[in-house]
Amino acid sequence: MAETSSSSSQTTPETGTYAIVEASGQQFWVQPNRYYDLDRLHADVDAKITLDKVLLVKNGDAATIGKPYVQGASVELKVMAHRRGQKVIVYKMRPKKKTRRKNGHRQELTRVMVESISVGGKAIS
């Protein structure tokens, strides 16, 4: 049986640079040069957004944990597009009655690209 070895140049969650940020009342694990869907933000397409509520920053082997936030840490985002999520169907029915209600909902989302993670004004990615 052939052995497989993983390349050390790949960015994995254990060895790479990442941050855990708070946005839209949720926590997101973000890595540079990846995109994420957040709840709709009031920003134009191609606008830059800075998130200052950073809970954790990991750079290689060094990790910085905030209490509750890391001081001087920020994540730079670029708004790529405004979009809508998948449709969720809500169906309510009362048995033995002629009561049925069907509603659909699509969440308004903003797709953002993580451009950089910085601590103390110095970009680490």
Curated annotation (Swiss-Prot):
Q: What is this protein called?
A: Large ribosomal subunit protein bL21
InterPro entries for the chain: bL21-like, bL21-like_sf, Ribosomal_bL21, Ribosomal_bL21_CS
Similarity comment text for this entry: Belongs to the bacterial ribosomal protein bL21 family.
Q: Which GO terms describe its biological process?
A: translation
Disulfide pairs?
none
Q: Quote a single Gene Ontology cellular component term.
A: ribosome
Biological role: This protein binds to 23S rRNA in the presence of protein L20.
Q: Which UniProt keyword terms apply here?
A: Ribonucleoprotein, Ribosomal protein, RNA-binding, rRNA-binding
Which residue spans adopt a coiled-coil conformation according to this UniProt entry? none
On assembly, the entry states: Part of the 50S ribosomal subunit. Contacts protein L20.
**From which domain of life does this come?**
Bacteria
PANTHER family cross-referenced by the UniProt entry: 50S RIBOSOMAL PROTEIN L21 (PTHR21349), LARGE RIBOSOMAL SUBUNIT PROTEIN BL21M (PTHR21349:SF0)
MF annotations from Gene Ontology = rRNA binding; structural constituent of ribosome
Q: A Pfam family name for this chain?
A: Ribosomal_L21p
